[in-house]
Amino acid sequence: MNSLLMITACLVLFGTVWAKEGYLVNKSTGCKYGCFWLGKNEGCDKECKAKNQGGSYGYCYAFGCWCEGLPESTPTYPLPNKTCSKK
């Protein structure tokens, strides 16, 4: 029983430690989600936690929304073979 608890705790820990992080990216333009209030930022946090993103926490870093705890399926900046175009 103790072994099962230890294995479960390790799996949870690995999932938390190895979670993806990065800048949120607009898939159509290839650009980062921008922000102006550096540090704790409600807009970035809300975007990161949105169902389509799946992150656990977001804040403004270097004028872009940085997300932590993202699933591997969520794309982050830069997108492969796509440059930022603000058209």
UniProtKB/Swiss-Prot annotation:
It is found in: Secreted. InterPro entries: LCN-type_CS_alpha_beta_dom, Scorpion_toxin-like, Scorpion_toxin-like_sf, Scorpion_toxinL, Scorpion_toxinL/defensin. Keywords: Disulfide bond, Ion channel impairing toxin, Neurotoxin, Secreted, Signal, Toxin, Voltage-gated sodium channel impairing toxin. Residues 20-85 form the LCN-type CS-alpha/beta domain. This is Toxin CngtIII. Beta toxins bind voltage-independently at site-4 of sodium channels (Nav) and shift the voltage of activation toward more negative potentials thereby affecting sodium channel activation and promoting spontaneous and repetitive firing. Disulfide bonds join 31-84, 35-60, 44-65, 48-67. Its main location: secreted. It comes from Centruroides noxius (Mexican scorpion). Belongs to the long (4 C-C) scorpion toxin superfamily. Sodium channel inhibitor family. Beta subfamily. Residues 1-19 form the signal peptide. Expressed by the venom gland. It comes from the Eukaryota. GO terms for biological process: defense response. GO terms for molecular function: sodium channel inhibitor activity; toxin activity. Has the structural arrangement of an alpha-helix connected to antiparallel beta-sheets by disulfide bonds (CS-alpha/beta). SUPFAM superfamilies: Scorpion toxin-like. Pfam families: Toxin_3. GO terms for cellular component: extracellular region.
